[in-house]
């Protein structure tokens, strides 16, 4: 909540919350859709490489506090690309924070790019094409967002192509049932 509020101010992005406390109360979600609502509102304040660095670094500090020595993080470029944020901006900000984590805390990491289930497979293929430029930084691809009406079979050919490109695959599943 604190970082979301800070980045909204820094980037002059209006959010529907007047304080950190209001954001914190919005985090009392009861189902996947209410979680996704606050998640996407938070995503909207991420604009610059520095923002992605700051978000990743905050996560790394929590990892350090919890004595985590390896982490595999997911990111959703499709949440940002339509707003004009470049794939390079996203991946460089995340990667620089993860490199700093390795250098300063010896926390190792891997990056997994996720496709958004509620979007069509064609838009996911476009993002996969971008991801191929960063195979040195992205270990795998995944699937997340709303499951209702978006079964994994919808993305069968996408995942086949990702595997052909050398990516490992994973998917969030079960948050909303069959």
Model-predicted segments: where are they?
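Metal-cofactor-binding active-site regions of metalloenzymes
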Residues: 1-167, 176-178
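Active-site metal-binding loops of divalent metal-dependent hydrolases
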Residues: 173
């Amino acid at each position: 909540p604190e970082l979301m509020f800070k980045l909204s101010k820094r980037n002059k992005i209006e959010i529907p919350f007047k304080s950190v406390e209001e954001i914190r109360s919005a985090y009392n979600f009861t189902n996947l859709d209410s979680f996704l609502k606050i998640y996407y509102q938070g995503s909207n304040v991420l604009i610059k490489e520095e923002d992605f660095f700051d978000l990743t670094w905050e996560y790394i500090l929590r990892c350090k506090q919890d004595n985590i020595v390896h982490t595999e993080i997911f990111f959703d470029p499709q949440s940002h690309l339509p707003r004009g944020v470049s794939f390079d901006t996203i991946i460089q900000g995340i990667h620089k924070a993860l490199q700093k984590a390795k250098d300063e805390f010896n926390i190792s990491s891997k990056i997994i790019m996720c496709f958004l289930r509620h979007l069509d497979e064609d838009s996911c293929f476009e993002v996969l094409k971008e991801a191929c430029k960063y195979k040195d930084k992205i270990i795998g691809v995944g699937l997340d967002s709303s499951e209702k009406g978006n079964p994994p079979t919808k993305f069968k050919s996408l995942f086949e192509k990702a595997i052909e490109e050398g990516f490992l695959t994973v998917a969030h599943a079960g948050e909303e049932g069959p």
